[in-house]
Amino acid sequence: MTMTDPLGDMLTRIRNGASRRKSSVSTPASKLRARVLDVLQAEGYIRGYSVVDFGNGKSELSIELKYYEGSSVIREIGRVSKPGRRVYVSVKSIPQVANGLGIIILSTPKGVMADHQAREQNVGGEVLCSVF
């Protein structure tokens, strides 16, 4: 069965794993998913991730979730731009999450980055997801 929203599937796996207090979750690998995980790791929302190669052309991302005092660092994570409704913003209209406590992850011409990096580089793009 084909997956219509691979990024949304990864975010759901992270959300479900965090709610069940799992130490790690796995998801099929792709370049976009890895770039989003790079941003999540740089911003301190996950411990890290590793690529597990099965040798038959398929690989998987093993994501290590992060907890602080028994509760997940990720309180909310959700998809903004969906396959049926893409959301694009200019640099001036990049939204804030929880008055700046959370982040927006954008796909820009300069790569996948957090909202504050996009403002610094003066670039807009597609709003992939929000994390708080």
UniProtKB/Swiss-Prot annotation:
Per the entry, what this protein does is:
One of the primary rRNA binding proteins, it binds directly to 16S rRNA central domain where it helps coordinate assembly of the platform of the 30S subunit.
Assembly information from the UniProt record: Part of the 30S ribosomal subunit. Contacts proteins S5 and S12.
Record-stated family: Belongs to the universal ribosomal protein uS8 family.
Question: Is Transmembrane among the key words of this record?
Answer: no
Q: Determine the domain of life of the protein's source.
A: Bacteria
Q: Which protein are we looking at?
A: Small ribosomal subunit protein uS8
Give me the Gene Ontology terms describing cellular component.
ribonucleoprotein complex; ribosome
The answer to whether the entry has keyword RNA-binding is yes
Q: A GO biological process this protein is involved in?
A: translation
Q: Which InterPro entries match?
A: Ribosomal_uS8, Ribosomal_uS8_CS, Ribosomal_uS8_sf
Write one Pfam family the protein is assigned to. Ribosomal_S8
Q: Which NCBIfam families match?
A: PRK00136.1 (NF001109)
Which keywords does this Swiss-Prot/TrEMBL entry list? Ribonucleoprotein, Ribosomal protein, RNA-binding, rRNA-binding
User: Which HAMAP family does its entry note?
Assistant: Ribosomal_uS8_B
What GO molecular function annotations does the UniProt record carry, in alphabetical order? rRNA binding; structural constituent of ribosome
Name of encoding gene: rpsH
